[in-house]
Design a protein with these regions (language model features):
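Conserved HGGG/HGGXW glycine-rich cap/lid loop of the alpha/beta-hydrolase fold
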Residues: 5-59
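Flexible "cap/lid" loop of the alpha/beta hydrolase fold
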Residues: 103-104, 109-139
Length: 261
């Protein structure tokens, strides 16, 4: 079982579950907790191999990592805590996991907030994955993470996100990195399915105006999917919740509150 923390709000029956990306941990949401727990019950979790769901715990996972099995780790926590339905907030690869949960367990997902969402890999990102695949067993994994961080978050105003990304990634083990990296083999057909199949779940995509790797595909997606909305954050890169926390918190909480009216 993965590590998780709960912040209860006795004045609310609504739950919000936060899902971080690859190489991160629940600590990336530190700028969200204070505001969100004023309005909702909050569930924070560390994906397998990340944060306090460390290597010793993940030794229990003998089988190959898949998006389905990792998504089921999250669903297991909701079932243990008897959370029948939750809003989900994710960033980067965490948005893929949330979308996977919505596909398999639509009745458990009240809404989706997708920060720095990955729904299609452009030519540059596909090349980056292929290059990393070649070097992953040759060089220390942290080198690959640093290259990813620089390419995905290249500008000066992305520095905080970039350094946080690298800091969190250093806590991973090399073997754990390789397990997660193998997920890239199933990512393209999965994302294609997500783009083709629209769910009726209210979805807000929150994308940085400078997220040149992933923004354009989300613009196309939100024009085609009626249940989806796009919010573009000015002067912001990939990790929107870290770079522009006030903007992110105000707009996402407003979105969630609007659903209950």
């Amino acid at each position: 079982m993965i590590n998780y923390n709960i912040y209860r709000n006795n004045c609310s029956k609504e739950w919000v579950t936060f899902v971080h990306g690859a190489g991160g941990s629940s600590s990336i949401w530190f700028k969200q907790i204070r505001d969100f727990k004023k309005h909702f019950n909050v569930l924070l979790l560390d994906l397998r191999g990340h944060g306090k769901s460390n290597y010793k715990i993940t030794n229990a996972f003998k089988k190959k990592y898949t998006f389905s099995s990792i998504a089921n780790d999250i669903v297991e926590i909701l079932k243990i805590e008897k959370i029948k339905k939750s809003h989900f907030v994710g960033v980067s690869l965490g948005t893929i996991l949330i979308r996977h949960i919505a596909e398999d367990y639509p009745n458990m997902v009240k809404s989706m907030i997708m920060g720095g969402a990955i729904m299609k890999l452009n030519l540059r990102s596909r090349f980056l994955i292929k290059l990393s695949s070649f070097f992953k067993s040759i060089v220390p994994y942290i080198w690959i993470y640093k290259i990813f961080a620089i390419i995905i978050m290249p500008y000066k105003n992305h520095k905080e996100s970039r350094l946080l990304f690298i800091k969190e990634a250093k806590r991973l083990y090399q073997k754990e990195f390789l397990r997660w990296f193998k997920l890239t083999s199933e990512i393209n057909p999965l994302l294609k399915l997500f783009r083709q199949v629209e769910l009726s779940i209210p979805t807000l995509y929150v994308m940085g105006a400078e997220d040149y790797m992933f923004l354009e595909s989300i613009k196309v997606l939100t024009k085609e999917h009626k249940s989806s909305k796009l919010l573009v954050v000015p002067n912001c890169g990939h990790v929107v919740n870290v770079e522009k926390p006030k903007f992110f918190n105000n707009h996402t909480i407003s979105f969630l509150n609007s659903l209950s009216k």
